């Protein structure tokens, strides 16, 4: 949908300081009501409720163009906005700290890889699930342990690891096993269901083990500001899988659907 953009401001609208022209920015994809910015029911998303960035030029609200100073390329910076803000929003909602052990299914994906890096930044112990062919790429993100994508006996595969948080964008038929291995008082945070939204669940697992489930979609504006700080001081790094010229957008989308990549695919106008 072209939600992640990095570029340079070339023009501004009425009421916007002309000094912003020439400023390097990345986009905050969440469109908020300027009169009621805290109301989650009055939000849209860049590339959905507003035309996105699959273009040579794009427009956005001034508040959504976030200044950034970095030696990273535009293509590298374009990997951050959507995936990393989604991940940081999930970890923020789940109150992840250095006392947690976090399990990340789908760690080779854009959000999954961001979850690995951002949870490590918080000092948590991180265990990643990914297909064996992608283990080397995932290892570069810094998890403490990497397991197969969907071990038949997840508890045995984890050994003595005590999982306090599952940060998930996968869902699907494996979901119940993710919940089953959570420690008492554990937290499950979710912002996607790429393997399927319908799951079977025994509610007794939820209440007898005092679990907390948190959905995460609309992020607080401060999340994006925090991400920029992390990028500028080098605390997180881009996971750029491939680039395609804008005229090869169809090929880029086909590569994304094929899911043979690790990280994010970027289109360059």
Where do the model's predicted regions map?
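Rossmann-fold dehydrogenase core element
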Residues: 184-191, 200-240
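Glycine-rich beta-strand-centered segment in the early N-terminal region that forms part
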Residues: 1-34, 69-71
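Mid-domain Rossmann-like dinucleotide-binding core that forms the NAD(H)/NADP(H) cofactor-binding site
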Residues: 72-151
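NAD(P)H dinucleotide-binding glycine-rich loop of Rossmann-like/cofactor-binding domains
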Residues: 29-106
């Amino acid at each position: 949908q072209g939600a992640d953009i990095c570029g340079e401001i070339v023009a501004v609208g009425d009421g916007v300081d002309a000094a912003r022209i020439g400023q390097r920015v990345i986009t905050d994809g969440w469109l908020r009501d300027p009169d009621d910015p805290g109301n989650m029911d009055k939000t849209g998303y860049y590339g959905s409720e507003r035309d996105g960035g699959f273009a040579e030029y794009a427009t956005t609200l001034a508040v959504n163009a976030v200044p950034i100073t970095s030696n990273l390329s535009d293509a590298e910076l374009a990997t951050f906005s959507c995936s990393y803000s989604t991940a940081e929003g999930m970890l923020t909602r789940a109150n992840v700290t250095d006392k947690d052990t976090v399990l990340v299914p789908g760690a080779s994906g854009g959000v999954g890889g961001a979850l690995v890096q951002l949870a490590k930044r918080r000092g948590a112990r991180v265990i990643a699930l990914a297909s064996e062919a992608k283990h080397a790429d995932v290892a570069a993100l810094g998890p403490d342990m990497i397991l197969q994508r969907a071990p038949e006996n997840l508890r045995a595969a984890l050994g003595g690891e005590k999982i306090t948080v599952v940060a998930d964008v996968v869902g699907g038929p494996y979901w119940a096993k993710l919940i089953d291995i959570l420690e008492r008082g554990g937290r499950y945070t979710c912002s996607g269901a790429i393997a399927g939204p319908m799951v079977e669940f025994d509610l007794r697992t939820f209440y007898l083990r005092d679990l907390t489930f948190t959905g995460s979609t609309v992020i607080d504006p401060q999340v994006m500001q925090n991400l920029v700080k992390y990028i500028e001081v080098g605390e997180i790094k881009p996971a750029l899988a491939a680039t395609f010229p804008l005229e090869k957008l169809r090929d880029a989308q086909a590569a994304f659907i094929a899911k043979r990549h690790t990280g994010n695919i970027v289109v360059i106008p």
